[in-house]
């Protein structure tokens, strides 16, 4: 793994962790953080060489940058599906629902036919961008990823290095 990729993953994980670094975090939030970060440390990433063409399964107007609590909850519920036990899922939801919107990470959720169907985290670091924690309710995350990468809110042309850290439900 190259230095930039290591650094951007470290920044993303620190960003997630900081949301429960408060005076009185709940036990559940801390346990959820431990689960989430343990999973994050067991993933592989790759550098994207060619920007994929937008796939028609997800429309750009069906992908939203998370900017209010209800979308945070939807993001949290989608992410929690990565864990098999309902207890672990509840802990991860408790942890992720503490997120406060701030740079360098942005959360995104995707909808298909009005139903939550995908989520991802976008971390920006210099002229590098990491799309991570990609979860989809379908077996193919490529269609969500292609539309997200071409989403007007990302301004992808600003980034010389794009890294992908996939994960499927």
Summary of predicted features, one role per range:
Residues 43-44, 87-89, 108-112, 142:
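A short linear-motif detector with a strong N-terminal bias
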Residues 104-119:
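Conserved beta-hairpin
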Residues 47-56, 111-113, 128-137:
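Short, Lys/Arg-enriched charge-dense amphipathic segments
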Residues 5-6, 81-97, 102, 127-169:
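Acyl-donor binding region in acyl/amide transferases
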Residues 122-126:
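A short acidic/small-residue loop/turn micro-motif
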Residues 7-12, 43-95:
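Short amphipathic alpha-helix that is part of the acyltransferase structural core
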Residues 1-60, 162-169:
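Acyl-donor-binding surface of acyltransferase catalytic domains
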């Amino acid at each position: 793994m190259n230095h930039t990729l290591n650094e951007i993953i470290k920044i993303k994980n620190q960003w997630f962790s900081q949301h429960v670094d408060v005076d009185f975090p709940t036990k559940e939030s801390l346990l959820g953080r431990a689960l989430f970060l343990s999973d994050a440390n067991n993933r592989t990433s790759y550098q994207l060489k060619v920007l994929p063409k937008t796939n028609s399964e997800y429309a750009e107007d069906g992908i939203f940058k998370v900017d209010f609590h209800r979308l945070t909850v939807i993001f949290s519920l989608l992410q929690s599906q990565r864990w098999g036990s309902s207890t672990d899922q509840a802990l991860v939801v408790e942890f992720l629902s503490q997120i406060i919107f701030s740079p360098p990470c942005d959360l995104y959720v995707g909808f298909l036919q009005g139903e939550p169907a995908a989520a991802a985290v976008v971390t920006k670091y210099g002229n590098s961008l990491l799309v991570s924690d990609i979860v989809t309710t379908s077996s193919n995350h490529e269609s969500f990823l292609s539309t997200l990468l071409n989403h007007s809110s990302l301004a992808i042309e600003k980034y010389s290095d794009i890294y992908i850290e996939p994960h499927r439900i």
